[in-house]
């Protein structure tokens, strides 16, 4: 009889590659290695920005070892069968995962697990297509949308356009500088390529975009106002918009400085300017977001590209909150070697475009 674990082997083989750079805690793990352990669950923390559980196992020397296993956001895992009750202390499980780079740390990044009753739970990377083509076309850009997972390509594009100052900042980056460890949301336009549900509302005087991984809505003013002089800098910046036919044009300025505001480790400055054009595809099943990203302090030239979102009227936003203690947990035991590995991963990204 073929077990669920046997069915996962091909996928596990595929996943034995470097972990995505966008994952705020990829630094501690060796994405080229895959290990398997069996043991007993001692703790399960179903919290954001990453789910953790702990497994007590016996090593080759016969000693008892407790492993810390990290997975994805609760919003992602909830869509592939996970709940806050998926694991209980005392459950016997088998875990397939990427181990920590630091051999002294019993720490893993989950690929999949199997419970004694045959239940298999996987990471987000092994999910099926979560937004099959809808039966109806979108009437306009308003509605619920699921972005393609395109942020790794965005990282590669920005790395190529970084000027001398941007490259120097990229090379000097250390993981303790990562704003994600302080629950700071992902910056624009990176978040446009994160695979989390977005809802667009079109009102008389504004457009409201709600991303399920942020507590703050993005407001685009449509009443003809300009950007305020000496306005307050903020994470989302100040956005104004207008219609050109069926195309929503959005201009955003007054961004607060962000250590990763222009890519994986490229900062952004108050000079950052983002222009977006939202329009439906010919099939009316996808939303195209063309954008121009400018920041002369860190870029040699503007980045011109696009993201695509899939129409997903059957999906809804899952409430999100970020737990600061959980957000910082991955920093424990991070070694200097991990930072060196990050630099090598960035170099590969720039040279080959292989950014995950």
How should each PLM-predicted stretch be described?
Residues 1-9:
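Bacterial N-terminal signal peptides that target proteins for export
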Residues 13-14, 31:
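Short, linear, compositionally biased motifs with a strong N-terminal bias
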Residues 20-24:
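Boundary at the C-terminal end of the N-terminal hydrophobic targeting segment
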Residues 27-356:
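PEST-like low-complexity, intrinsically disordered acidic/proline/serine-rich tracts
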